[in-house]
Amino acid sequence: MENVQILLRQHVGAPCAAIVKAGDEVKKGTKIATPTGLGANIFSSVYGVVEEVLEDRIVIRPDEEQKDEFVPIEVEDENDKLALVKEAGIVGMGGAGFPTGIKLGINLAETEMAELDAEINPELPADFKLEHSYILINAAECEPGLEHNIRQIEEQSDKVVRGVKYCMEITHADKAIFAIKKKNNKAIEILRKAIANEAEISIHLLPDIYPMGEERAVVRECLGVNLTTMQLPSAARSVVVNLETAAKIAEAIDEKKPCITKNLTVRGKINGGNQAHVFMDVPVGVSVGELIERAGGIDGVYGEIIMGGAFTGKATELDAPITKTTGGILVTIEFPDLHGANVGLLVCACGGSEERMREIAQKMNGKVVSVCRCKQAIENKPGAPLKCLRPGNCPGQVKNNMQFKKDKCEYIIIGNCSDCSNTVMASGPKMGLKVFHQTDHVMRTVGHGLYRTLRVSKQVDQLPNGK
C-alpha cells in the first residue's frame, strides 16, 4: 500500500486541525484531526506512522500488515446515539459532506411545516400541512455509471435499515421512505424483504432521470412538496440521508466504528472492459491511481480522470487521495477536437460549474464566446453554488439557444439535467447549433446513452402501499 494522504477538509465547513505530529504511530480509528468550526472529526484509516503534517493533509506511511481491528470511538454516554454519530466523524457520504451529527440534531416531531411557495406548488392548498415527519433515504444513486449504493443495498440491507431506524429515533421522525430508481429490480426486492415487518418504513420508486438524487427532488418525489432554493428539507418536516451515510450511522452506534472507509465505483477506460468495479470499505486517503490499478489499470491513452460523477465530478490526478465523499473514479476516452470553433456554454445548477465547463471546452479545443445560465439556476448569494428552482423539471431553453446563435456559436456544451437537455434539443439543432453534453465523453466510455432527447417517462408506477 502506498502512503495514505488524509485531507483535513472532507466536509462542508472549515478544515480540521491536526492533533498528531510526524513520527506518531497511529492505528485504524486513531483520531488525528478535530474541527475548528463547522466540520467533523477525522481518523486514521490505517495502521502506520505519520510521515508529514501539511497545511491541508496528514500523510501516513502504512504498516505492511493491516489488522481488521480499529480503535472504538468513545463518548460520555454510550446510549447517546447522536453523540456517537458526531464523534464518529460521519458526513454526507453522497458527495455533499455536511456533518451528519449536525443534520440529525433536529426534533422533527416538534418541527412545523414551513410556508410553501405557491408559485412552485400551484396544486397544493395554501394551508397544506404534512401529517407526518420523515427520514428520506436517498438511494437514487443519481450519477450515471456508479453502482456502489445499489451494491450496498444488495449486500448490507439489514445494516442500512438499522441505520435508518436510528435516524428516526434520533430525530423523532415517525416515518421513513427509501427513494430508489425503479430500474434497480434486484435491490428493490431485497429492500422489500428487509422492511417487510417495518410498518413505518416504505419505498418510493423514482424514474431513471437525472437529478432524482438532488435533495429537494427527493422531497418532491416522496412527499409531493416543492421547496424553494433557500429551504431545507426540514421545511417539509423531513431530513434527507444518503444510503451509505445510514450504514455508517449503524456502524457508529452498533460497533463504535469511526468513519474511516468509503464505498466507491471505478469505471471507464480500464483494462478488461468498461464494467463497474465496486470497492467497499476502501480506507480514506488511498490514491486514485492505486484504486485504478486494483480495477485493472488504464487501457492506453485516455481523456481525463474524474473524481465523483459525470455531472458534478471534477478532473483529478492519479496521486489524489479519496475522501469521505468520493463516489466515483471515472477514466474517460479522449475528447473530440473542435479545432478552435466558437463554443457557447449553458451552465446549469444540475451539472458542472462554469469553471468546469470552460475546462472541458479547452480540452475539446473550443473557443468560448458565449456563456448563458439555465433560467432555473438560482444563485442564492454571490459566489454560492447554483441551485435549481425545480430540479428535473425544465420550462424551456429557447431564449438561451437564440443568444448562442446571436453570438455566432457553432457548438454548445450543456451541463443540464435530463429534462433541460430535452428542451435544449427541441430548438438548438433547428437553429444549426451542434450540441455536446459535458458528460458525453463519460457516457460514451461506459456505454450509457447520451443526454439529449428525453425518452423515458418522468412518472413511474409505485409499489402497493410502498411495500
Task: List each language-model region with its residue ranges.
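Acidic, low-complexity mobile loops and tails
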Residues: M1-A18
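Generic structural motif
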Residues: Q10-A14, V26-G29, F43-E52
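Short hydrophobic beta/alpha edge segments that flank linear recognition/processing sites
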Residues: V26-A40, R57-I60
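Gly-rich Lys/Arg/Thr-decorated short loops/hinges at beta-loop-alpha junctions or inter-strand turns
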Residues: G92, I135-N149, I378-A384
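Hydrophobic alpha-helical positions that pack around
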Residues: A114, A118, D174-V288, R294-V301, ...
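Cofactor-cradling patches in redox/metallo enzymes
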Residues: N149-Q152, K183, C372-L463
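Histidine-anchored nucleotide/phosphate-binding helix
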Residues: E154-I170, E359-A361
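Redox- and metal-dependent alpha/beta enzyme cores, enriched for Fe-S-associated oxidoreductases
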Residues: N342-L389
